[in-house]
Amino acid sequence: MMSLRKITALYSKNMKNIFYNPFIMTSPVAILLLAYLFGAFMIPDDAPVEIITYLLNMVVIMNAIMCGIMIMSVLIAEEKEKNTLNVLITSTVSGIDFLAGNVLTTTTITIICNIVIYFIFKVQNILPFGGYFLITSLGAIAAITFGATFGLLAKNQASASTMVAPMALLIIIPPLFRGNFFIDNVLYYFFTEQIGIALTELAQGQLSVLRIIIITANFTVFALIFGICYRKRGLA
């Protein structure tokens, strides 16, 4: 059974420790710096909505990868590397408590970055905050679930980063090859693509519920994959 007290304690420990872990701190710092550079230097005052949403989509998707996927995988792998995971699991802390604490930590970082990105880009008159928050938060949850699987498979923080990097490239690079029927159709159903489409539709005032359904379906698939890996490998 999950223990709220233990989850809160793990969450507090993680939030304090992230400032001393370069694998983790690099991600939000890089994302917010990128958002600032885009918002301050690449978007003129008279920039069309299409350009603003395109750059915003790029940063939000990068945040889902670097914070959502990367940090979640590193948090799990870190405990393996330090050999503290076995101690936690053999104590009164359950595997579910451990995972919940890490999910809360990663969710907090990713969502805070998304909120800061929103205000850096100054899109209050283009995108309603409620819709933006819903879309990016759903995307963050899908990314975090995806990252948890990498954390289970990785032996340490370095291997977690090495495993995530090629996947990040596969997510980022395909948009450069538009026009390929196979890539277009595969990419269309991935949550990162749906985040971009959803934010574009939101800016146009015509957000389709299909975006929410597909992002949620991504989360469901990632959760099933994680569940299979967890049953076969466990945490330790």
PLM regions with names:
Residues 22, 137-173:
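A structural motif at transmembrane helix-loop-helix junctions in multipass membrane proteins
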Residues 57, 65-70, 100-101, 127-135, ...:
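Short alpha-helical transmembrane interface motifs in multi-pass membrane proteins
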Residues 216-236:
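Junction motif at the cytosolic side of a transmembrane helix
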Residues 2-9, 179-213:
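Short hydrophobic, aromatic-rich alpha-helical segments embedded in or entering the lipid bilayer
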Residues 1-24:
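N-terminal Sec/SRP start-transfer signal
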